[in-house]
């Protein structure tokens, strides 16, 4: 009888282990504006092809995304255009899209009473999304915000705050997108948005077919990039190589009582 019970125990344990191994991993990619996903788009394509469940969260509506390529006016009309563009891009990438409706710059122009409640609401909503999706990993902006854009930096900081705010029910990793300083131009640009390579502890290769698909999705963002600009970006950025660079958030479990 004891042998039968032990056999059943090992059988159940083995089945559970295999089931856990075969369960699809979940990635949550969280960025500020429609088109920000392009920073890691080749990686998103790669992971979808590998069977990862990828959910892309875009925090803002893109209402302030005016530029020299068209005569769009900032406001509700542009936000509506950019929402459609984002749906097009997400469809090509093969990701599930959660597009929130926070204003660009999170109402910073309205001062403390306008901005802070808006920013706090975003943090709480991101917490609810993480609770619901239960990702194995999260990718967002690091402190550089790629371009030092205030929305990029604030969204990355908001995601980080949620990640740090509690012990989660499952193991979860947080990654910041980065760019090696030596791939950037002047010392000024390196200081503003680069990372020394030793800090970029995750470097994931992608194929040029995955790169092509990523740029196919960028064509959806017509209000931001005419086709000829997308094609030029595609060729220019090949010089960065076929890797996405990330920095995993790391913390020591050992509590110390000194700084040095």
Where are these regions (language model features)?
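Sec-dependent N-terminal signal peptides
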Residues: 4-13
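Alpha-helix boundary/capping residues
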Residues: 11, 133, 162, 218-222
């Amino acid at each position: 009888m004891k042998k039968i019970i032990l056999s059943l125990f090992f059988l159940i344990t083995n089945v559970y282990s295999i089931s856990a191994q075969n369960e699809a991993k979940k990635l949550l990619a969280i960025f500020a504006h429609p088109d920000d996903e392009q920073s890691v788009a080749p990686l998103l394509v790669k992971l979808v092809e590998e069977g990862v469940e990828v959910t892309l969260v875009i925090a803002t509506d893109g209402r302030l995304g005016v530029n020299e390529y068209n005569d769009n006016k900032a406001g509700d009309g542009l936000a509506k255009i950019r929402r459609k563009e984002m749906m097009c891009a997400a469809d090509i990438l093969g990701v599930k899209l959660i597009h929130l409706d926070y204003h660009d710059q999170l109402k910073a122009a309205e001062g403390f009473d306008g901005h802070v409640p808006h920013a706090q609401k975003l943090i709480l909503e991101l917490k609810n999304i993480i609770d619901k999706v239960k990702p194995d990993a999260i990718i967002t902006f690091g402190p550089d915000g790629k371009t030092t854009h205030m929305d990029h930096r604030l969204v990355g900081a908001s995601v980080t705050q949620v990640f740090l705010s509690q012990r989660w029910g499952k193991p979860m990793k947080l990654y910041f997108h980065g760019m090696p300083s030596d791939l950037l131009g002047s010392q000024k640009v390196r200081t503003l948005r680069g990372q020394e390579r030793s800090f970029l502890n995750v470097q994931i290769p992608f194929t040029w077919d995955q790169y092509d698909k990523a740029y196919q999705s960028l064509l959806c963002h017509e209000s931001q990039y005419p086709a000829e600009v997308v094609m030029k970006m595609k060729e220019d950025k090949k010089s960065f190589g076929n890797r996405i660079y990330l920095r995993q958030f790391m913390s020591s479990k050992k509590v110390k009582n000194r700084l040095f």
